[in-house]
């Protein structure tokens, strides 16, 4: 009976059980809880919940800090109305918009638990076909760059990937795929527009507060490719655009995708989570050093912490670089490049103009990618060989990868006049009695591979000099 339902108004699980059995008999009971939910939601939506005490709001309403009990009650009511929304679609038709508004417009005002409750409620509505995938994904994507919680980001990414996967399980869903890819393009392009005031690159603590929108776009697109859900030119175009992104993490992840490391974006995400703990420790020591008594021991601890953080980042970068060299490359994606010549020229321009800005590891990755694109598509970028010449020294860090990249870029259509100076530079620097046998072997093998790909680049006098080293392996 209705009286029996009223007895459970403060016991939401029991009331929920009754309402699910006979929704029409308990409409008034649900409406009472809905109105209670609405009153608490308006407090959150008005920004009152986290305002400073004593502040005044429009409409002569005084700002009141919401208590923990009220927050807990709101979370319970939110779960309650989401569970019963299919039974009362007319009453709860505004619920999806409420959840989206709370998550996107009042994200900073919500407690971590309330954010998760809103997300779970939205997922529940989506699973019960009350909201479309388009609405669901358009709400989740902006949250990736808003939230600072690694748990929340993991939940969001899993929900996004699973939703796209299920939509394409039986057959491709071109409408949804185009919509999501459009969102991802927008996320990357916003980071490349210097006039956009919302670009994450402008924030001083961008490296400490997690990934940018563009990095999440690269990660989602890479994951879709890895799962063989998206294998089209549009996905490749998105990742190709990210290869020249001004944010170093975004660029590195996109480049590593084309080099064959399909987990690059995911690894970059985990790395940023791990790195987030390092600067936090350094920042704590800096704060203690500022406000506390200045001692030599404290300064020494701070100096050691900074050195440890730098050393760890360098080790991670070098390890990732060596792993990338072992991959055969994502040739399927490279073959799908829409305009390989323009992509190669843009990539080389980014490499040469950012010569001082890029770290050596990033430069080597770009060299590797550029050489593979040139080899696969038979491209000719003349300035590439003169640029590479300055790195052709035995003592150069990562010289083996640089030599491999140079040789790999050569093909039968490469002009001989741009290769001859490079071969001479290698011969003079690597092939002479004053260096070790390993250095001579590296130089000879590189020259041998270049000549195998383009035999006409070898000059007779240089060949006669190199004959003495023909047994170097």
What are these regions (language model features)?
Residues 70, 107-111, 145-149, 191-192, ...:
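Short inter-helical turns and helix N-cap capping residues of alpha-solenoid HEAT/ARM repeat scaffolds
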Residues 128-131, 146, 162, 166-169, ...:
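Short amphipathic alpha-helical interaction elements and helix-loop-helix interfaces
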Residues 132-136, 151, 167-171, 195, ...:
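Short, flexible/disordered secondary-structure transition segments
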Residues 1-155, 159-176, 222-226, 240-241, ...:
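Alpha-helical solenoid scaffolds in large eukaryotic transport, assembly, and signaling factors
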Residues 348-361, 365-473:
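Eukaryotic scaffolding regions of large macromolecular assemblies
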Residues 45-68, 191-209, 431-435:
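Acidic, Ser/Thr- and Gly/Pro-rich intrinsically disordered linkers and low-complexity segments
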Residues 166, 172-197, 212-349:
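Alpha-helical repeat/alpha-solenoid scaffolds of the HEAT/ARM/MIF4G superfamily
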Residues 70, 74, 115, 153, ...:
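Residue-level detector of extended alpha-helical repeat arrays and alpha-solenoid scaffolds
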């Amino acid at each position: 009976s209705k009286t029996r339902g009223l007895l459970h108004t403060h016991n939401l699980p029991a009331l929920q059980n009754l309402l699910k059995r006979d929704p029409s008999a308990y409409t008034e009971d649900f409406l009472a809880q809905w109105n209670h939910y609405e009153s608490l939601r308006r407090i959150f939506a008005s920004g009152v919940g986290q305002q400073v005490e004593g502040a005044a709001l429009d409409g002569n309403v005084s700002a009141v800090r919401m208590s923990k009990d009220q927050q807990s009650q709101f979370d319970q009511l939110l779960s309650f109305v989401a569970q019963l929304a299919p039974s009362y679609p007319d009453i709860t038709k505004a619920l999806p918009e409420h959840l989206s508004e709370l998550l996107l417009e009042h994200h900073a005002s919500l407690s971590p638990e309330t954010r998760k409750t809103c997300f779970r409620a939205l997922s529940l509505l989506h699973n019960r076909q009350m909201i479309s995938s388009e609405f669901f994904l358009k709400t989740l994507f902006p949250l990736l760059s808003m939230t600072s919680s690694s748990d929340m980001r993991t939940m969001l990414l899993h929900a996004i990937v699973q939703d796209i996967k299920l939509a394409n399980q039986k057959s491709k869903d071109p409408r949804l795929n185009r919509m999501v890819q459009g969102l991802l393009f927008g996320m990357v392009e916003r980071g490349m527009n210097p006039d956009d005031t919302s670009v994450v690159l402008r924030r001083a603590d961008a490296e400490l507060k997690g990934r940018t929108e563009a990095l999440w776009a690269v990660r989602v697109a890479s994951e879709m490719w890895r799962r063989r859900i998206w294998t089209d030119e549009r996905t490749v175009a998105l990742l190709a655009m990210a290869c020249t992104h001004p944010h170093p993490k975004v660029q590195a992840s996109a480049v590593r995708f084309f080099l064959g490391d399909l987990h690059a974006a995911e690894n970059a995400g985990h790395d940023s989570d791990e790195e987030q703990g390092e600067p936090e420790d350094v920042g704590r020591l800096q704060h203690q050093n500022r406000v506390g008594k200045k001692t030599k021991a404290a300064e020494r601890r701070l100096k050691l912490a900074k050195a440890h953080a730098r050393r760890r980042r360098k080790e991670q970068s070098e390890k990732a670089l060596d792993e990338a060299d072992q991959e055969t490359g994502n040739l399927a994606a490279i073959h799908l490049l829409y305009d390989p010549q323009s992509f190669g020229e843009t990539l080389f321009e980014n490499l040469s103009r950012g010569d001082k800005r890029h770290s050596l590891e990033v430069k080597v990755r770009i060299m590797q990618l550029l050489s593979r694109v040139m080899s696969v598509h038979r491209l000719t970028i003349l300035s590439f060989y003169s640029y590479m010449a300055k790195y052709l020294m035995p003592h150069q860090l990562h010289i083996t990868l640089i030599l491999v990249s140079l040789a790999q870029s050569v093909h039968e259509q490469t002009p001989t006049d741009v290769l001859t100076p490079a071969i001479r530079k290698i011969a003079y620097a690597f092939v002479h009695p004053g260096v070790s046998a390993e250095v001579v072997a590296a130089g000879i093998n590189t020259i041998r591979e270049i000549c195998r790909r383009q035999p006409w680049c070898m000059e007779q006098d240089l060949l006669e000099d190199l004959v003495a080293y023909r047994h170097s392996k």
